[in-house]
Amino acid sequence: MLLVSLLRVAARYWRGQRPYVEDMERIVRYMRRRRERGLSAVPSSLVERMQGLGQSNPNRLVGLQMRKLRRTVEYVYRYVPFYYEAMDAQGVKPTDIRSLADVHKLPITRREQLAENPEAFISRYPGLVATTTAQTGGTTGKPLQVYLTTEELHYYAAGEALTGLMMGWLGPAEIFQTHFTVDEAIESIVLTRAAHKAGTLVLTFGTTGTLDDHVESIFRERHIPGKKPKVSWLMASPSHLWALTRQAEEMGVDFRDSGLQRITTGGAMVSEDLKQRVMETWGIPLIEGYGLTETLTCAAGQCGKSERMHFTDVTGYAEVLDPQTEEPVPPGQPGVLTITTFYPDRELMPLLRYWTDDLVILSPDRTCACGLPTTQILDIVGRADHMVKVGLQAFYPQEIGDSLLAFPELVMPPRFTLRTEQREDAQYAIVDVELSASLSPEESEPLRQRIADGIVLSRYWQVKIGAVKLVVNLRPAGSLEHPFAYKHRHLVLAQRNE
């Protein structure tokens, strides 16, 4: 039966169909039993064959994307009310989509449309039943409600369990400690269910307890039959990860005594300073990824062979568009990431050309040492809807937030405002930032100057020397109205290489 399941999963995968959950879970159980016996999750001979499938030539991948795109367009036109009306309004029929180049004919889906009437995006396909809701964090506006079927949830969890077992970060011997509540985000829901399927012990702290309790749990040695003695995987928000790191340092723990092999952080953007701090303190290099609740089947992650993030081209189609003209921009140039989620990977709420408002840069080169010929993200620049212009110069708050995370005297995650002002001598970018505690004037001025020196403005839109002047003001905690809380739908993993 195992061989039948493997063959059926592979066949349905290349036909553009969603594998049966029963087949995936049968493979998960097989991998779990192998791990329980101290073996690798997959025999080496099978690994080679699976790598051969993943390293398929780009033409085969494009053909698969084309089949899935056509099937998705036909499906949403027939069963999703919003897209039937939107496509008719633009005079577009499913038969007009003959190649990937025709995707520009399809309507762009805005976040505001999804927020205003999410039920209009639910498929009316007979037999589909919404059983689970996932909510976006609300970090970029009103939280969105996203609906899933039980089958979809099992499918995503089984997929994560398969990946985790093959990569070695899930298994019956592992202990997973999470500081997200299980219903706080779709990532938590899926990862927790995946861990259960793989036999991993899950310790759910949420935000309860003290930092001392949280650190003690990470380093405490347990004596549970069949389990590793210490927590092997930690998941927390960036601000909580900062706090855990500081608390562990204050407690004087020896980080070499940690059993951590992997750290996952999400729900907020992660700065280069935090990445470096985690590497230096915990000894675990960070592996980056990107994902949204709205397009949960379509994500991107590093393979470990390069700094780029591979997009999951088999479950969705990524475009990068000019924020003003909505026309495609060439690889290597920043633009707004727009995602189409493929049916049947996303069955209840598939989305066409979802405008993420995230500014990214795609790599002009699809080749990678890992062999995957997929779309690759070079960098996530910022939020298109957060851009602040000073004359002809563009500024992105995310770039300022990257620098502010280096200063422990500030509220974490940083809370700040960015405004512009034209004065007689020059144009000014003025940053007001909240302090975590009050400081004397003697302490404030050196800190203010260090922050001003550390802020990096506009990494990709060059600022001419002297063209824009920067002013930093320190404010009491909680005093700023409508600050940027420096949150972003960005996922970063830290993983120890054996």
Segments from the language model and where they lie:
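Conserved AMP-binding/adenylate-forming
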Residues: 261, 270-366
